C-alpha cells in the first residue's frame, strides 16, 4: 500500500469542488491513513502470526477494513488520543450522513458549520477557528459565500492533514 504524501493529500482535496466529493475523498484518505497505521499495533510478530492472523485482519474483506471498527481497536489499545479518535469518527459520521442525503449541503451551509465546530483539530487552532467564526457571523455586506466556502475547505483540508500526521506509526 503506497504512502500518501502531504502534497498528494492536498492535491486530492483541492481538486474537489463540492462538499460531497471533498468528504468522500477525505474519508478515503483517512481510511488509507488508518490502514497504514494498523500494522504498527502488531509488534514483534513472527512470520507465521503475520501471515495467518495479521494479514487476514487487515485484508480489505477483513474486520479491520471498517473505519469504525479499526478506530475502536486503535483507541481501545491506547494508541490514539481521544481528540483524534473523536475527529476521525466525526469525519466518518459526517461522510455517512452526506452519503444518505438527496441534496448535499455546501461548504457554507449551517450543517457544515456545525460539523467543523466539533472538529478538534479545527477548533483548537484558535487563529483559524476565530477567522472562520468572524466570517460566518460577519455583517451581510462583508460576508461572501465563495470566500467563506474557501476558508471552510481550507480548514477541513488542514484537519485532514493534521489527523494524518497523528496517524504516523
What are these language model-derived features?
Residues 1-169:
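Amphipathic alpha-helical interface elements
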